[in-house]
Amino acid sequence: MLTSGVILLNGGLLSPNPGLIFWTTVSFVIVLLILRKLAWGPIISALEEREKGIQSSIDRAHKAKDEAEEILRKNRELLAKADAESDKIIREGKEYGEKLRAGIAEKAQAEAAKMISMAKEEIEQEKRRALDVLRNEVAELAVMGAEKIIKTSLDADMQKKIVDSMIQDLSTKRN
């Protein structure tokens, strides 16, 4: 029935109609079967592929995490070894420096002792030379004094004997 442009059906939109429910259910089951045949397989395989992809990504992430932890552990070990090696090198450098310093000090002491010894020897030689010169001068003075005293000139052999005798006398008196 048509009244003023509105179609009124028997019953309302919310009142149950068994025929409509039946055909709606049949249509739904048919669409469901068609979708199951045509779309369910691809949807499931797409979901399985997606699940495999996600699982693969998770596995790769775990593997990358494990590798990163291993690399971090190795880096820490290498850093510890490098620290130990640097400490060893520093310690060896200090020991070498100390040995070098001790060697230089020892060498300097030996050189100083050698220089002192050489200086003492040189002083002793100069002392001997000075004594020899002094003896010769004393001998000459003694000869000149003796010549003046006795007013005679002695020959060279006699003069040498007298000088040697005086030198021996002086040496024995000094020692």
From Swiss-Prot:
Transmembrane intervals: 14-34
Superkingdom to which the source organism belongs: Bacteria
Known partners and oligomeric status: F-type ATPases have 2 components, F(1) - the catalytic core - and F(0) - the membrane proton channel. F(1) has five subunits: alpha(3), beta(3), gamma(1), delta(1), epsilon(1). F(0) has four main subunits: a(1), b(2) and c(10-14). The alpha and beta chains form an alternating ring which encloses part of the gamma chain. F(1) is attached to F(0) by a central stalk formed by the gamma and epsilon chains, while a peripheral stalk is formed by the delta and b chains.
Keyword Disulfide bond recorded: no
Function text: F(1)F(0) ATP synthase produces ATP from ADP in the presence of a proton or sodium gradient. F-type ATPases consist of two structural domains, F(1) containing the extramembraneous catalytic core and F(0) containing the membrane proton channel, linked together by a central stalk and a peripheral stalk. During catalysis, ATP synthesis in the catalytic domain of F(1) is coupled via a rotary mechanism of the central stalk subunits to proton translocation. Component of the F(0) channel, it forms part of the peripheral stalk, linking F(1) to F(0).
Protein family: Belongs to the ATPase B chain family.
Topology in membrane: Single-pass membrane protein
Pfam families: ATP-synt_B
Protein name in the entry: ATP synthase subunit b
InterPro entries reported for this sequence: ATP_synth_B-like_membr_sf (IPR028987), ATP_synth_b/b'su_bac/chlpt (IPR002146), ATP_synth_F0_bsu_bac (IPR005864), ATP_synthase_B_chain (IPR050059)
Principal location: membrane
NCBIfam families: ATP_synt_b (TIGR01144), PRK14472.1 (NF011042)
